[in-house]
Amino acid sequence: MASQGTKRSYEQMETGGERQNATEIRASVGRMVGGIGRFYIQMCTELKLSDYEGRLIQNSITIERMVLSAFDERRNKYLEEHPSAGKDPKKTGGPIYRRRDGKWMRELILYDKEEIRRIWRQANNGEDATAGLTHLMIWHSNLNDATYQRTRALVRTGMDPRMCSLMQGSTLPRRSGAAGAAVKGVGTMVMELIRMIKRGINDRNFWRGENGRRTRIAYERMCNILKGKFQTAAQRAMMDQVRESRNPGNAEIEDLIFLARSALILRGSVAHKSCLPACVYGLAVASGYDFEREGYSLVGIDPFRLLQNSQVFSLIRPNENPAHKSQLVWMACHSAAFEDLRVSSFIRGTRVVPRGQLSTRGVQIASNENMETMDSSTLELRSRYWAIRTRSGGNTNQQRASAGHISVQPTFSVQRNLPFERATIMAAFTGNTEGRTSDMRTEIIRMMESAKPEDVSFQGRGVFELSDEKATNPIVPSFDMSNEGSYFFGDNAEEYDN
């Protein structure tokens, strides 16, 4: 984006910092992931997990969820005020898997939230380390993006299920801060806004009184976040209209859905960060790696390098394919659920297949699943090359944004065309161009019509050998121009249910 003078880099958002230079950013991001690693090691000690059990991704997820729950102020307050049967508001826990006599056993553990908070703060130099918590939320969100489809949620808000590539970060909690807002897709922001407007339509008092004033501030803030993701003047002008509306209603919902559709071709800028499971940082810290001293970046070579030398295991159900389970976690680690499969495959060095062809369910194991038949296997999370993560959406320039396949939001800054089915997308734009946003709508449609599927994005950007940490020799891959690669093609994944 042209005007990045005032923007903080998303490493700065991630660490809550003011403007810092590159070295300071690397150090503070390093401090953040180092703290996660120290916390994880301490939890493994508390739970007396063996080395193998500590590398089990399911155990990592349980421990991550416990600390997120321990710091969820609003929910904790709610639980204390609305005691529900069988839920202790002061405790948190989950399933821990242990290896016993050649079999995997599930053990449900329960901890005082206060105790978990103490361990977390201790691992983070006595601070609350909110940035580390957000980092874990984004890792869970990336895992959800790769695992589940949000068709139902899209349909409920009146959007088209084919807009799934705009839904990055749709399961992030509201408290995920600026770093969370940066990774949310256009569709996610639109959906949050539509839900808000619908509540206002159904509940007369939603915008009224002291609470309503706060609601209004939240509404305008969300509008500004979404506006900042758009890269064309007309899209931004439409967002101003939506934001300034005296009494948001169906007209605003229409405008928002129009904007979401337009983002399939005039893509928004959405940040991508490689957030890894806590156990990976734990392994590195345990082996003596000093993240803060070495520095760390979420968008460069560091996560790739970390995954090259980490062995992580996963429980595998009887008819699941371990290679497919690995692909799922690899995509989650690199926030690549919405990336073009041609690009992901090239970087990973093995073919990345669409989700409809995966023989694997989610990573987490439900409490009613039979442990007798559970096996475990090593996740293959290594890559052949590395590439810089992007936040641009891959539009060729400001004036004329380039084309987007109906289902790609680029993750890696790598030269390619972004193929799309123009007829499918444009069919949605017949009809309504009257009303107060008519000139903007006309302008947006004109830009979309002039976008070409064969336009090359990220000109000259390539992938790098893993030995090339300074990114000096880009290798620009050549792709079959016609062959689009959406992960969600022929999809049969399960829905995301809270």
Swiss-Prot record:
Keyword Ribonucleoprotein: yes
Protein location: Virion; Host nucleus
InterPro entries: Flu_NP
Gene Ontology MF term list: RNA binding; structural molecule activity
Signal peptide boundaries: none
Disordered: region residues: 1-21
Gene Ontology terms: cellular component: helical viral capsid; host cell; host cell nucleus; ribonucleoprotein complex; viral nucleocapsid
Extent of motif Bipartite nuclear localization signal: 198-216
Family named by the database record: Belongs to the influenza viruses nucleoprotein family.
Record protein name field: Nucleoprotein
Chain's gene name: NP
